[in-house]
Amino acid sequence: MTSLKKIYSGKVRDLYEIDDQRMLMIATDRLSAFDVILDDPIPAKGQILTAISNFWFDKLKDVVPNHLTGDQPEDVVAAADLPQVEGRAVVAKRLKAVPIEAVVRGYLAGSGWKEYRQSGSVCGIALPAGLKEADKLPEPIFTPSTKAAVGDHDENISFAQCEAIVGAELAAKVRDTAILLYQTAAEYAATRGIIICDTKFEFGLDENGTLTLMDEALTPDSSRFWPADSYQPGSNPPSFDKQFVRDWLEASGWNKQAPAPAVPLDVREKTAAKYREALEKLAG
C-alpha cells in the first residue's frame, strides 16, 4: 500500500490512515490460531470475512451504529493500490476503542466448557449443574475478556473487573448491546440452518460518546458457527471456521509457541471452503 500510511497491523487486519476521522481497514488472508499468526494464508479469507461482516453490519444497524462511513475504499487509494483493497477493505470511522472484548455465549463450548467443568461457572456467572458440552444455556451470557496485544492471550474477566476497567455505566451498556446483537443475529442464523454458539464483538465510542460496533461482526474468526442439522449436545459439533487448522495443529504436536509449523495446502483450502460455506448459508 503506497498511497496511505499504515497505522496498525493486527492478527488479521491492517489499518491505514485516511484523515483524522477515517481509516482504511484491510482484511488480509492471515490466520491466527492459539494467538500465533500462521505463515501460510487462507485463500480469499479476507474477502469472505469482509463480505460476512458487511452483511451483519447492515442487518444489525438498527440495534447499534457501526464503524462504516459509507465511503468506498476505491475512492481513497491510488490506482496502483486498487488490487490490495478489492473486496477486502472498508472505510471506517476512527473511534476510541473500548478496551474489552465483548464475548457473548449462547452455548457451552471451548474455554467456557473448560471453566464450567472446573467451577460450575463461566467468568463468575454461576450456571445450572449437569450441563453437557455444547448444551444451550438458559439464556445468553456476557463473558468479557481483556484485549490482549498481538501475540498475547486474551484473558477472561468477571463483570466486576469489566466495570473496573471501563466504568459501571459503559460496562452495562456494552453487555446489554452485545447480548441484544447476539440474540438478533442468532435468531436470523437459525432460519438459515446455523447455530451461533458464541461470538466476540468489539466496540468504540465516537466523538459524541455513542457506542459503535467496530472491527468485524459475527464472522467465522470471531464466532463459533455450527450446522444446526448435525448439532448434538454432549459432543463438540463441527464448525464453519478455523477448527480444521486448529485440529491439524493440535495433532501435529506443536507446542503453541511461535513459529507455527507450515500448514498443508489441503487443510488451508478446506478451511477456506468452510468460511465460504458460512457466507453462502448466511447471506444466501
Swiss-Prot record:
One of its GO terms (cellular component) is cytoplasm. It comes from Chromobacterium violaceum (strain ATCC 12472 / DSM 30191 / JCM 1249 / CCUG 213 / NBRC 12614 / NCIMB 9131 / NCTC 9757 / MK). PANTHER family: PHOSPHORIBOSYLAMINOIMIDAZOLE-SUCCINOCARBOXAMIDE SYNTHASE (PTHR43700:SF1). The keyword Transcription regulation does not apply. Pathway: Purine metabolism; IMP biosynthesis via de novo pathway; 5-amino-1-(5-phospho-D-ribosyl)imidazole-4-carboxamide from 5-amino-1-(5-phospho-D-ribosyl)imidazole-4-carboxylate: step 1/2. Keywords: ATP-binding, Ligase, Nucleotide-binding, Purine biosynthesis. GO terms for molecular function: ATP binding; phosphoribosylaminoimidazolesuccinocarboxamide synthase activity. The gene is purC. It comes from the Bacteria. The keyword Nucleotide-binding applies. This is Phosphoribosylaminoimidazole-succinocarboxamide synthase. GO terms for biological process: 'de novo' IMP biosynthetic process. Its EC number is 6.3.2.6. SUPFAM superfamilies: SAICAR synthase-like.
